[in-house]
From Swiss-Prot:
Component of the small ribosomal subunit. The ribosome is a large ribonucleoprotein complex responsible for the synthesis of proteins in the cell. Required for pre-rRNA processing and maturation of 40S ribosomal subunits. Belongs to the eukaryotic ribosomal protein eS19 family. Gene3D superfamilies: Winged helix-like DNA-binding domain superfamily/Winged helix DNA-binding domain. PANTHER family: 40S RIBOSOMAL PROTEIN S19. The gene is rps19. It holds the Pfam family Ribosomal_S19e. This is Small ribosomal subunit protein eS19. GO terms for biological process: ribosomal small subunit assembly; translation. One of its GO terms (molecular function) is structural constituent of ribosome. Keywords: Cytoplasm, Nucleus, Ribonucleoprotein, Ribosomal protein. The keyword Ribosomal protein applies. SMART domains: Ribosomal_S19e.
Amino acid sequence: MPGYTVKDVNQQEFVKALAAFFKKSGKLKKPDWVDTVKLGKHKELAPFDIDWYYIRTASVARHLYMRGGVGVGAMTKIYGGRQRNGTRPSHYSRGSRNVARKVLQSLEMLKMVEKDPNGGRRLTSIGQRDMDRIAGQVVVLSKKH
């Protein structure tokens, strides 16, 4: 297990494993509005997956691991998409700012993320340690299959 980082594992498997860790640990509380919210104005429906909040939190944590100093505005760009306008041309639309802000705040409550003095948020040493440990577990599980 030692010596493996988040960069060494498949990103989809890692995000699923980290989301399962968040859900199983019980420290990450899912807000009440999670089942009724859309993830951006370009979306027509709310997400179908009931655990989407854990998956989004894991995805944001992985993104902060890869490049720190990312704030709410950058997260809305990352999770944006194509807005369909009927017969008119489609355009890019940003993701929900509220969802991005609440995800970052919940990661701060877990002490995995802290505010960067240069702007945005960055991963703490505790967060990096936990994510590297989970990456090592993902490597062990992927070698068994």
